[in-house]
Amino acid sequence: MNRTNKLILGAVVLGSALLAGCSSNAKIDQLSSDVQTLSAKVDQLSNDVNAMRSDVQAAKDDAARANQRLDNKVLRICK
């Protein structure tokens, strides 16, 4: 190989390496963005679950009070 061919080959290899590096950085940036989006969704789901827990507890408390009222009425009728 003469000197010109070596320079061209070197330029092609260097250019390919730089393009591959840019592609990898773009992919890393996209993955980072995806991770941030998923983290935000996980936080929102966690907040939703916590809100549901308090709603479920309130429903259980209401059901327990309703059952107690029914039990009291049944006891009065049976007396």
From Swiss-Prot:
Superkingdom of the source species: Bacteria
Coiled-coil regions, chain positions: 28-76
S-diacylglycerol cysteine lipid sites: C22
Lipid bilayer topology: Lipid-anchor; Peptidoglycan-anchor
Lipidation (N-palmitoyl cysteine): C22
One Gene Ontology CC term in the entry: extracellular region
Induction: This gene is probably poorly expressed.
Cellular localisation: Cell outer membrane; Secreted, Cell wall
MF terms in GO: lipid binding; peptidoglycan binding
Sequence repeats: 25-35, 39-49
Database matches in Gene3D superfamilies: 1.20.5.190
Family annotation (Pfam families): LPP
Family annotation (SUPFAM superfamilies): Outer membrane lipoprotein
One Gene Ontology term from the biological process aspect of the record: periplasmic space organization
N-terminal signal peptide: 1-21
Residues recorded as bearing N6-murein peptidoglycan lysine in the entry: K79
HAMAP family: Lpp
Family affiliation: Belongs to the Lpp family.
Complex formation: Homotrimer.
Protein name as it appears in the record: Major outer membrane lipoprotein Lpp 3
Organism expressing this protein natively: Salmonella paratyphi A (strain ATCC 9150 / SARB42)
